[in-house]
Amino acid sequence: MPTLSFARLHYTYPEAASRALDGVDLEIDFGLTLLTGASGSGKSTLLRVCNGLIPHFHGGVIGGSARVLDRDVIRTPTRELARDVGFVFQDPELQAVYPSVERDVAFGLENLGVARGEMLRRVGDALEMCGIVHLRSRAVGTLSGGERQRLALAGVLAMRPRLLVLDEPLSQLDPEGSAALLGALHAAVQGGTMALVAEHRHHLVLERADRCLLMAGGRVTPCAPDGPVQPAPARASQDAPASSELSWRLHQVTAGPAGVAVLHDLDLAGGTGEVVALTGANGSGKTTLLRTIAGLLPPLAGSVERRPGRIAYLPQNPSALLHRATVRTEIDWTLRRTHAAGRADAMLEEMGLAAVAERDPRDLSSGQRQRAALAAVLAGSPSLVLLDEPTRGMDGAARAALTAALVRVAGRGGSAVVATHDPQLVAAVATRVVELGDGVARVRQPLAEAAR
């Protein structure tokens, strides 16, 4: 009996005009399956059928057959499926329950009634598999986005599910974190767990995958696991203004969340027409630096200087910025606040969002939400743009739109600082690379070397 079996499966979200899944036929019974496809193709929707969130939480109209671990998903309560189906969401920030790392990993085991001794062993094993034993006593609120992704996987692995479902698990991870997560995933599969992984950075997963599936238009077709990897984008044409002025400066800045310093005595500056890429391991202080430049996190010592003008800040979790009924009204709201002319249609086209302009941002895929939030913060031509992991959940077309947007910002005399683990983005747009580590900053050049 296949672990996962879908036949003529179709699904439509509440009030949606078209199907998100449109006749999926699929059987999988072992190993690691990689699920690829453009943003909005139906990947997250298909994954949410696996643990019963569709239809039991999201509602909507579902038809056909969906069986997981020999259970009828349409008729089986989500709580029953959760015992055997481990799920890691696109937004790990929303998955943590307890304020401490160790307690959060133990949460699922507590619900299963696992004995304390066995619980402690499983928690320790899961932390070790994900390479986060050193975070055991940390508060969840102090973790970076990548560290939270590894925490979410540890909590799921501790429950030893029969089916592991991961939605963009590598989106915020540095190379070390990606290697640790893929190693943990491989160990779980070798131990008999079946895994279904949706991932845009598919080249990282391909060598370990037993099969590859492509989603398009709500349907699934096989693709070769050893198929071609999307080439790196060419270096964007970026003509900076002839004269560069100071955009922002940190003078002997020490900074960190909750009064705990993670950056020490930094002296950094950025000029107009410049795109600075911030690189470094998860937890190295990239988000702290962005928030300090933005004025959202006062420095513990030192001073911050900013050129007058509007600052646009995109956090790691784009959902924090999206509160209005449609994508268009999100952009219109920014334009009204900045007294800019109505460029909503142009911005929607530039970011590839015209087809979802009247959709609720909360109903979009992760990559589409990322683009919607980016369009909203860029509307009104800000003078300083600060982006935290902007390629999270983005497909190739969305990355190209982001690259073009950053080039436009620099070309009109603005400046940008981008925290990223994406070497392709660094190679495409960065005029300077600043690597963070051990609380200090190092400028890395040439760009080709920094992007490796």
Regions found by a protein language model. Give the residues of each.
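Conserved ABC ATPase signature
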Residues: 139-143, 147, 360-364, 368
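ABC ATPase NBD Q-loop/coupling interface
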Residues: 65-80, 295-318
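Hydrophobic anchor residue at the start of the ABC signature
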Residues: 153, 374
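Catalytic Walker B motif of ABC-type/P-loop ATPase nucleotide-binding domains
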Residues: 164-168, 385-388
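Conserved ABC ATPase "signature" region
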Residues: 117-135, 341-356
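ABC-family nucleotide-binding domains
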Residues: 174, 395
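H-loop/switch region of ABC-family ATPase nucleotide-binding domains
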Residues: 198-200, 420-421
